């Protein structure tokens, strides 16, 4: 009986994965990464983005299945955690555990904060014009960290702006590396990752990032130890650079 049950479960899983494969084949592939593919299309009549964590041939199948499922669940929970706290993030439509697919709301007609900053700097050529955006970023990320949610990959490409852009309505995306932690060290590292990405992607914007940190400090109930840890992480980073 046990063998028959296992065979039936395996057949059901294979059938579910085949249905998912056929559905994805009808969508538009918009991004191919090392860990996942991102598709755009319609899901139950709604504009959707589907993130598919595809299996890696170099990993043991059982380990791969557990890792893919865990990361898919973590990302879905992170999005829900944000939304419950009033932080804008895509709506989760459906989680396909058989194929490790996450079906989410597409933020239509949005632009990345990265593209917005680059366009604004090309037009205005003055980082002062970014201060309001930087302050808004500080408020949003302070709220996220106050929920003990660590993004894990903070860049300006992982933040979207809804239109009208002047309202600075930021939507956080791509929580694939997220996790829950109340440790100031983890939050400090999160900010350090953003700082490195921000200043390397957007040269001559140091004043804007300073405005971001001031806003973060004023908006977060737990900012003091986090910003102290950020300074420590910076120092460690400089020491590693000097050592080579």
Curated annotation (Swiss-Prot):
All copies of domain Protein kinase, residue ranges: 24-244
GO terms of biological process kind: tRNA processing
Protein name: EKC/KEOPS complex subunit Tp53rkb
Catalysed reaction, written as an equation: L-seryl-[protein] + ATP = O-phospho-L-seryl-[protein] + ADP + H(+); L-threonyl-[protein] + ATP = O-phospho-L-threonyl-[protein] + ADP + H(+)
Bilayer-spanning residue ranges: none
Organism: Mus musculus (Mouse)
Keywords noted in UniProt: ATP-binding, Hydrolase, Kinase, Nucleotide-binding, Nucleus, Phosphoprotein, Serine/threonine-protein kinase, Transferase, tRNA processing
SUPFAM superfamilies, alphabetized: Protein kinase-like (PK-like) (SSF56112)
E.C. number(s) listed in UniProt: 3.6.-.-, 2.7.11.1
Top-level taxon: Eukaryota
